[in-house]
Amino acid sequence: MLLVGRIGKSVGLNGGLKLHLESDFPECLKKGVKVSVAPINAFSRASSFKDYVIHSYEHAKNLLFLETIHTPEKAKELTNLGLFMSEAESKKLCVLKEGEFFYCDLVGLSVVEENEFLGKVIEIQRISQIDYFLVETTKSLVEKGLAKIFLIPYRDFYIQEILLQDKKITTHNAKTLLENS
């Protein structure tokens, strides 16, 4: 399951929900699309997920309406939970442009700079509208006293190329970030 957003407060009398989007693809939130709601930390517990169907989504207002939620009381039960979509459904609904990737496809890729393996992407975080690769440093570099984990901004200055078929990200200047972490 992929995290699409975080559900905020109840809005209005018809069960509207403020949605704090975690995705770059709001067009996936269409009427009739199946989504799941669960605590944010529920990734590994399938029993935590409750399924819903989207009634509508107003992107300008970040308002989500689910088909079976029609009262503020029912909406409040979902406050502070995560909105999830299956990986297959996400890939079916979201059309990627050249150079765009799903986070789930980038996690696990090797980070390489000048033929030196720096580590693996373990997570992607968005901070102030910038995506960062959270990289677990390779053991040999950690043994040399470098940080166990470091961040690489997803910017051209650092990221040269993403090769999904080779399962690697080639970088430039990322080792300097590691050395200064």
UniProtKB/Swiss-Prot annotation:
Which keywords label this protein?
A: Chaperone, Cytoplasm, Ribosome biogenesis, rRNA processing
Domain PRC barrel: start-end pairs: 98-177
Note the SS bond partners.
Answer: none
Which one GO biological process term can you cite for this protein?
Answer: ribosomal small subunit biogenesis
| Molecular function as annotated in GO | ribosome binding
Highest taxon of source? Bacteria
Where it sits in the cell: the answer is:
Cytoplasm
**Per the record, GO CC terms?**
cytoplasm; ribosome
Q: How does it assemble?
A: Binds ribosomal protein uS19.
Q: What does this protein do?
A: An accessory protein needed during the final step in the assembly of 30S ribosomal subunit, possibly for assembly of the head region. Essential for efficient processing of 16S rRNA. May be needed both before and after RbfA during the maturation of 16S rRNA. It has affinity for free ribosomal 30S subunits but not for 70S ribosomes.
UniProt similarity note: Belongs to the RimM family.
Written domain comment of the UniProt record:
The PRC barrel domain binds ribosomal protein uS19.
Q: Spell out the HAMAP family in the cross-references.
A: Ribosome_mat_RimM (MF_00014)
Name of the protein? Ribosome maturation factor RimM
